[in-house]
Amino acid sequence: MSQIILDNISQNETVYNRFVIIHGRVGPRASYCPQTINVKHHENSFPEQTWVVTDLYFKAIIHVVPGDNTILFTTDDGGKLELQVYYQLLVDNPFYCIAFIVGKDSDLSFDAPHGAKNDIDEGIRKLRCAAYLWQAFTAECMYRNGYGRRSFRIEESVQPDTMSCLSPWGTERLTATINILRSDKTAEEIRSVPPDQLFHIAGDAVDKLHLPEPWHYMCMFLDTRYDPSTQKIRGHVALGGGTDMHKLGVFGSHSLHSFPSALEYVVPVFSDARRIPSYLANDANESSTIWECANIGIGAMLHELGHTLGCPHQPDGIMLRSYPIFNRSFTTREFECVRTGSKGLAPVLAKDECSWHHLDMLRFFYHPCFKLPSDPTYPSDIETNYFVKGETITFVNSTGIFLIEIEYNGQTKGWKEFNPPVGEASLTDAEIRSLSNASSNQDYRVRVLSRNFKCIDLNNVPEIIKNAKVESSFGTVYRSERYGLRGCNGKELSNILIAPEKFKPTKIRVHCGLALDGIEVFFGDESVLLGNRGGSPHDFEIQGSQIVGFQIRCGAWVDGISIVLENGKTSPFYGNANGGGLKSYLVPKGFQLVGFYGTLGPFMDSIGFFIK
């Protein structure tokens, strides 16, 4: 009787997604080594599965149902192991919707080898299976690297499930929903527009649903077609990104034919070394066989999902295109590879697999889509601010900054982690260049992430440091970042600068309608004005306290502003309290507010602050 050993899970663990990758070994009995291992699921909630054993190693994907599960592993020589595992649904987390975008006249088919199924029902089966592979792969990467069994959530509902070809037709389970979104464009229009317009076509199709915000969508264009005469894939683009409220990834269906359509087909597909016919796309010239094509299609779409989660291009991993070996996360044997000329690999161990980069997983650890019930909650309204002193730029977020990334040439080149996260993180230009090996004339971008998942990107930090310094009659003062995008082409106003010992305002008068017209600072009977006196005046008494910050509503212009005092008192929002995006500025510790700057068109389209 062979002994069964599970390497990546223990008894009575809690998991948070429907399918879980299991790594294990079987101990040989004398000269006999089992060739397969069988998995029986809890109370026959899912058909029994058989997985290959290679040189004593196996990988299996188990199915779990909400609550307690008993999973039985057996070998053909009587080896047996029962695994107890608890599946907790994360019903409060944001979820990813998976969808096909189809033309308004689409025939609802996709490119496939002659004679193969290629209707919308088969497409749904394949895309559903790919989504669960993304989720299980991510959860295993996170667990393996010490971040817990966490992954992004997929939109699911009780409906006929297709994740096993052995289930009776119509068997209902809680399974991934694959949405079908009709575009206003015809199929031929989708195939004819410049590729970058496909992102907007998909976004328009999602926008028509009028979904609650934020939303997360991964979309595949079903009407993608490969043209052998031009060797072009029409109706395909690989893009992912969006705004804080709208996250969108898009991809074409040119490799969908190679995807597994059920759990029983995962290993066969990733073991299928048959050549792709010349009338089908060979994406990136890395899709010559069925298994290589599946890697590129499933993996590249996961790469775009990574962009929607905020991941930039990384030094290695999924975000550098390590997905041509995506198959290795689910198989113990790799077959002939046209891309590399390799004749195969066996056994395929965990060390041979692709993964998310360490920085991606660190980002996921704090991402709202990956939140576990035991995770603390951080206030979402706290912004990351920065200030300059001397040659140093300091980033501030009271929830804790956990990562600063430095990017140039389209890729992360250096970073600094903070474990535990810190409320303030300071760097000089020289330190940034040292961390990223950037030359003295290399432009770079700095990205700062905090535990409440606020992210700011700054280009050209040396210029920010240089321009922040302003010489006044009472010495060097420092300029804050500018709030408002100068969308009205406003003219620069004269700076208001008042020596610290004299900056003791008695009240602030805000002039506004549905946007900020001006701020008037009173010192007894005297006042200074930034902007103009349009709109209506609104007075806020300071009463011997100090101004320590502002809440600003802004976008193309400054919609409104609120004043924060040292004694804890906060003014109402003056202007449009619902306009633009909410930003906050707090005077750093050890500094004092000494003035204002900004620009004025029909109303103020930017504002900033001076500190000393």
Swiss-Prot record:
Family: Belongs to the peptidase M10B family.
Highest taxon of the lineage: Eukaryota
Protein name: Putative zinc metalloproteinase C607.06c
InterPro entries: Jacalin-like_lectin_dom (IPR001229), Jacalin-like_lectin_dom_sf (IPR036404), Metalloproteinase_M10B (IPR053002), Unchr_Zn-peptidase-like (IPR021917)
Catalytic site: E304
Keywords: Hydrolase, Lectin, Metal-binding, Metalloprotease, Protease, Zinc
Disulfide pairings: none
Gene Ontology CC terms, in alphabetical order: cell division site; cytosol; nucleus
One GO biological process term: proteolysis
Known cofactor(s): Zn(2+)
Domain Jacalin-type lectin, chain residue ranges per copy: 477-612
Gene3D superfamilies (alphabetical): Jacalin-like lectin domain
UniProt-listed PROSITE patterns: JACALIN_LECTIN, ZINC_PROTEASE
GO MF assignments: carbohydrate binding; metal ion binding; metallopeptidase activity
Enzyme Commission identifier(s): 3.4.24.-
Enzyme class: hydrolase
Residues binding Zn(2+), per UniProt: H303, H307, H313
Cofactor annotation remark: Binds 1 zinc ion.
Organism, as annotated: Schizosaccharomyces pombe (strain 972 / ATCC 24843) (Fission yeast)
Pfam families the record matches: Metallopep
